Amino acid sequence: MEKKNLDWGNLGFGYMTTDYRYVANYKDGKWDDGALVTDPTVTLNECAGVFQYSQSCFEGLKAYTTEDGHIVCFRPDLNASRMKDSCERLEMPVFPEDRFVDAVEQVVKANAAWVPPFGSGATLYIRPYMIATNAVIGVKPADEYQFRILVTPVGPYFKGGAKPITIRVSDFDRAAPHGTGHIKAGLNYAMSLHAIVDAHAQGYAENMYLDPATRTYVEETGGANFIFI
């Protein structure tokens, strides 16, 4: 398939509307069949559970073009498993893991022209997510949900690609003991925004967070892996 006419080597890490996304809805205790759609907009009630009580979770993975022209993803089944854990922790209905993987395959195949070519340094970012959609007032789980997958071509997450970055030891905690740090809940990332904006303002690319219980052990960074040698 012919690729889109983009400057693949100079893509930033940002959103670009592509041709298709996957949507499935949960109502009356069951998921519908789901489908690929072309409309990128989401219309919700003003009192939707995602707005009022932050019932949302997401995943992130990538599709790559190999040297021989094939399109591949790395272990989407593990993302499906982690989303299952997130849903259970947030009292959201689990989207079946086999359907999760199938939906990823569908949306990547439908947007094959948006998967960056081999050697460009870019990838197709895949964002599965689930939100509470019906009106909820009073703290309780919603009754209706929507599972979606959007895709967008992206360049490296850090400007400049795979190069050394500056990291500071943050005064903020990334996750609370016995909290939601082990899942990919949207609320976790909202709480991290102030810390990363503050780090950038001081000239650092990223934070290194210490364990919140004792603040004596390294716990994680916000958006990168690290190895001590």
Could you tell me what each predicted segment is?
Residues M1-V107, V136-I229:
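Helix-start/capping segments and mature chain N-termini
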Residues A110-W114, F118-K140, G155:
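Non-catalytic, conformational "gating/processing" segments within enzyme and secreted inhibitor domains
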